[in-house]
């Protein structure tokens, strides 16, 4: 089981790496069109995340930064540990019910 999980993780990392390397990370900033206001503004990728000009329409999420990789790994670890814990919990309750609740 452990080897199959490690194989799946290796394939996921390989696919993710090929996706990141195929993305054009050296692209120039483009004008962003707001559909409601129909206004354009120049997107500055170095603008601060906490500035007032940064909102959901102008902030570009990048999956090739260290913090995004770390966050995705944390989400994966939490999901796997939750599944393992819930499987253990449900299995022990099922066995406990079978053994001690027979009447």
Swiss-Prot record:
Signal peptide: 1-25
Pfam families: Herpes_UL73 (PF03554)
Subcellular location: Virion membrane; Host membrane; Host Golgi apparatus, Host trans-Golgi network
Domain of life from the UniProt record: Viruses
InterPro entries linked: Herpes_glycoprotein_N_domain, HSV_GN
Listed GO CC annotations: host cell Golgi apparatus; host cell membrane; membrane; viral envelope; virion membrane
Membrane topology: Single-pass type I membrane protein
Keywords on record: Disulfide bond, Host Golgi apparatus, Host membrane, Membrane, Signal, Transmembrane, Transmembrane helix, Viral envelope protein, Virion
Transmembrane segments: 69-89
Quaternary state and interactors: Interacts (via N-terminus) with gM (via N-terminus). The gM-gN heterodimer forms the gCII complex.
The protein's role, per its UniProt record: Envelope glycoprotein necessary for proper maturation of gM and modulation of its membrane fusion activity. Also plays a critical role in virion morphogenesis.
Protein name (database record): Envelope glycoprotein N
